[in-house]
A protein has these predicted regions:
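N-terminal membrane-targeting/anchoring modules of bacterial envelope and secretion proteins
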Residues: 2-264, 268-272, 277-316
Length: 316
């Protein structure tokens, strides 16, 4: 029996029945992955280390080409919310640190291109699936062992943020195709752990608006795309940023001479946050002949100083 090739349909005879089968459509090509990540250009305090993003977002440059260039190719987007947060910060007007001049800032130049880029991103991803990477595109396997709760925090926040920027629900994914194997320098690991552990004390006493930029931002330290030099440079910059943050709630140290068996010495606590902060104060004398009366929890009003008397008893 001759076989007939049909382009539109085929006729099948099964048990005397005639079945009309439509031609099978060609299988759609696998979607092309588009990766939107970038090394950090913004410090934990919201100021920028450089103004390179203003160039990278241009239609002719890497990040701009991915968003501004129209394409009919089926794509799937892997997006890091840390990049989008940096671009959004540019839209609001931003300051760039002057290299080699501590404390000196200049205005950034990328406000308009950042606004256009975010608008174009929302449009270009409208018909494509979008996957949110954990915040900062960090080394997920490393974090799973060291700080799994923080990894979940990075995933949840990035999913919400990316969904907000693209204007639709997005899923979360731990990594993207072609991600590098992490090689995190020891100094960078130490910085990440130091900031993460010291932030814990602030989480219950100050607003998340104050802590989240630091808690989320340090995830970028573990990004596998950072080379050794960039990792060390970023580690030291983030550590400096956190040390400034850490001084917003502090005790002013003083020197006093004790001349009697019972003394009261003043201790000044400074609160640089925009919220009243309640802290527990523990004073431990180094001299075994000195005892200190217990101190109740102390509430320091926002943006103020409070003097707390420390009662000492000298044992003869």
């Amino acid at each position: 029996m001759k076989k007939l090739l049909a382009t539109a349909c085929a006729l099948l005879f099964i048990s005397g029945s005639l079945i009309l089968v439509g031609a099978l459509p060609a299988r759609a090509a696998d979607p092309v992955p588009v990766i939107l990540t970038e090394r950090p250009h913004m410090g934990l305090d919201g100021t920028f280390y450089d103004d390179q993003l203003a160039t990278l977002l241009l239609p002719s440059r890497r990040l701009g080409q991915l968003v501004f260039t129209p394409s009919r190719i089926n794509r799937v987007w892997y997006i890091d919310a840390a990049l989008l947060d940096q671009v959004a910060a540019m839209v609001d007007g931003y300051s760039v640190r002057v290299a080699g001049k501590s404390g000196e800032l200049v205005s950034g130049t990328g406000m308009n291109v950042a606004m256009s880029w975010l608008s174009a991103l929302k449009q270009v991803t409208r018909m494509n699936p979008v996957l949110a990477l954990p915040y900062g595109a960090p080394a997920t396997h490393w974090l799973e062992q060291l700080a799994p709760n923080e990894l979940h925090f990075y995933e949840a926040n990035s999913q919400l943020k990316v969904g907000f920027y693209v204007g639709k629900y997005v899923d979360v994914t731990p990594s993207f195709p072609g991600e590098k194997t992490p090689r995190i320098p020891g100094e960078t690991q130490d910085t990440y752990n130091f900031i993460r552990k010291n932030l814990k004390g602030y989480l219950k006493v100050v607003d998340i608006q104050d802590t989240n930029p630091y808690r989320l931002g340090i995830a970028q330290l573990t990004n596998p795309a950072l080379n050794y030099d960039d990792s060390i440079r970023l580690s030291r910059a983030f550590l400096n940023d956190f040390q400034v943050f850490n001084k917003r709630l502090r005790i002013v140290v003083g020197k006093y001479t004790i001349t009697s068996e019972r003394e009261k010495i003043p201790m000044t606590i400074v609160n640089g946050f925009n919220k009243d902060v309640t802290v527990s104060v523990v004073v431990s004398p180094l001299n075994g002949k000195v005892t200190v009366s217990p101190i109740r929890d102390v509430t320091i009003p926002a943006q103020s100083k409070l003097i707390v008397p420390i009662k000492l008893h000298i044992i003869a």
